[in-house]
Design a protein with these regions (language model features):
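An extracytoplasmic/periplasmic, membrane-proximal ligand-sensing/linker region
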Residues: 70-76, 84-95, 297-365
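A conserved helix-loop-strand patch within extracytoplasmic ligand-binding domains
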Residues: 153-211, 216-221
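Ser/Thr-rich, Proline-interspersed low-complexity disordered segments
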Residues: 28-72, 361-365
Length: 365
């Protein structure tokens, strides 16, 4: 007993010192930091930016298909040259389009242009399918590949009119014209070469029957003349020839009337009917107003429109509407080919005319 007690007494102080020293060491040691998970803001921002800048997929919109020509969404256009103040003619043009539409079943609209230049641009761009043209306007657009004649109108009993050369009988020219048959006799060159070196009375520098055609016929007959006198009217030409000393011969329109029978001449200068004679008269070489079509117009549509216009005279108001819209008395219409214009082309060929300038700047028929 004494031995065990003594052993315990010896070890106990040593144990206490070990505990004290261990406690002191633990208190002096640096505490281990707590590990906290770190967020990744950079990754979140990149993700948000990527989502924000992502380009949305474009929606595919189906392309609208244009309706067939002649349907409501794509009507056939019928061009008229009319000024805005010509309201009666514009209304008549609209009525004509309605009648053609009813006859054919197509959607047809009138298209009004203030001048030929505007219509020519539309025709060349394919913006108008059918249009009414004067003769030089047609020859120009046909040359440009933008017009093909469909129909021609009858005015004052003819589809094409002519020109006549007249003179005072005291001037001594030989007449190559038979008033009984209303036709010329002999060769045109013989008739016209009498005028070589003489002075003509023309109407104005933009008139087809009063300047271009007779001048071209004289050129074709190799007949040079002196500088012309421009009288501005057919009656003035007749008066100048009757008085004499102003010009040696004159020109007027023919076949669709005779200026010598004008009421003014008959009443105020009746002697002119005996004193002024026709030296030579052409055939009908100047066509009246025509209906032309764009060469791009489908043949079946052109034919159906052609037949509908030919039917207009059968309508009680058809010819009246045409006359109002075209601003001249229309008695009938008929189909013609482009060759119908060849005589006019031949007549003006030697003049080398600038048809674009003439048709764009002139309103004289």
């Amino acid at each position: 007993m004494t031995t065990l007690k003594n052993r315990f007494s010896i070890k106990w102080p040593v144990f206490l010192w070990v505990l004290i020293i261990s406690g002191m060491l633990s208190a002096c040691a640096t505490p281990t930091p707590t590990i906290t998970p770190t967020s990744s803001p950079t990754m979140i921002l990149e993700t948000e930016t990527e989502e924000a800048t992502q380009t949305p997929t474009a929606l595919i919109t189906p392309t609208a298909t244009q309706a067939d020509l002649g349907n409501l969404g794509n009507p056939i256009t019928l061009g008229f040259i009319l000024t805005p103040d010509e309201t009666g003619a514009i209304e008549a043009a609209e009525e004509i389009a309605v009648l053609i539409g009813e006859d054919t079943g197509y959607a047809v609209e009138s298209s009004i242009y203030p001048d030929f230049q505007s219509l020519a641009i539309a025709a060349q761009n394919g913006a108008v399918q059918l249009f009414w043209l004067k003769p030089l306007e047609y020859i120009y657009l046909n040359w440009e590949g933008a017009a093909q004649v469909v129909l021609v109108t009858n005015h004052l009993g003819v589809y094409a009119y002519g020109v006549q050369f007249i003179a005072n009988i005291d001037r001594g020219f030989r007449s190559y014209f038979d008033p009984e048959t209303n036709q010329s006799t002999g060769e045109v060159n013989q008739a016209l070469q009498q005028f070589s070196g003489t002075r003509p009375c023309f109407i104005n520098s933009s008139s087809i029957p009063g300047y271009f055609v007779p001048l071209g016929l004289l050129e074709n007959a190799s007949t040079p003349t002196l500088d012309p006198v421009f009288t501005q009217s057919y009656n003035a030409t007749i008066r100048a020839l009757f008085i004499q000393g102003i010009c040696d011969f004159g020109v007027t329109y023919a076949l669709n009337g005779d200026p010598l029978n004008d009421i003014d001449i008959v009443q105020n200068l009746p002697e002119a009917q005996d004193q002024i004679e026709v030296i030579w008269q052409s055939e009908g070489i100047i066509p009246n107003i025509n209906l032309s079509a764009s060469p791009n117009l489908p043949a079946n549509i052109e034919f159906n429109i052609q037949e509908a216009v030919l039917d207009l005279p059968l309508n009680p108001v058809g010819l009246s509407l045409l006359s109002t819209a075209l601003k001249e008395e229309i008695e009938a219409v008929k189909t013609v080919e482009d060759t119908f214009y060849n005589q006019l082309r031949i007549a003006i060929l030697p003049l080398d005319l600038d048809l674009e300038a003439i048709t764009h700047n002139s309103s004289t028929p």
